[in-house]
Amino acid sequence: ERYISLLTDFGFKRIFGTKPNKDLLINFLNSLFDGFHVIKDVKYLNSEHVGDVFAERKAIFDVYCENERGEKFIVEMQNAYQKYFKDRSLFYSTFPIREQAPKGAEWNFKLEHVYTVALLNFDLEEEAFDKNDINHDVGLLDKKTFKVFNDKLSFKYVEIAKFNKTEEELDTLYDKWLYVLKNLSRLDERPAALKEKVFTKLFEEAEIAKFTPTELKEYEDSLKAYRDVKNSIDTALEKGREEG
């Protein structure tokens, strides 16, 4: 393989979770929000959070940052289905909310927006979602009017496993990013369709031959962990088909 897999923990964090590559994260997020929300700059924040309640539950985000307006973004890559995945994403969103409360000072409870972006390498099979779409926006709405009750908490679930466009079918920047997310490690060279400057940097950063020995070892360990998870899922699915 010439390029890293962005589905691995190492690959995802290298491209989207490091300060030198914040322009890649900004471009990617802007493609997801498609003009609805424009991000000009981001500042990376501590991705490890410890709860302040009895259990002291810990949350470690893949990428945690804030934009120039102080709005918070949690960006997660999820390769395997979890029974309580929706509850987990809701739980994670509480950390950026609670940390906005100043300690030992009066506060009027005004919150900055918190966005959770979950990239799912599986079909969530969520009844509330349009089955023909893969990019889903979830928020706090009035059930009767469907009007926004509060816009400070937003969830974006992107089912990248259901993205099947070929190189010839890539029209938008959003299409191109999803194609790269899903297929980068399978490519031998940069496709002609990915002509934008941002992808020039992406392919340079993703080239395995440029890694230090330490980086290579970290990537190989991360790749093994990803493949172990993938094999476990494939085995379970195959067993289910045989029994079903």
Q: Where on the chain are the PLM-derived regions?
A:
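Elongated, amphipathic alpha-helical interaction scaffolds
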Residues: E1-E243
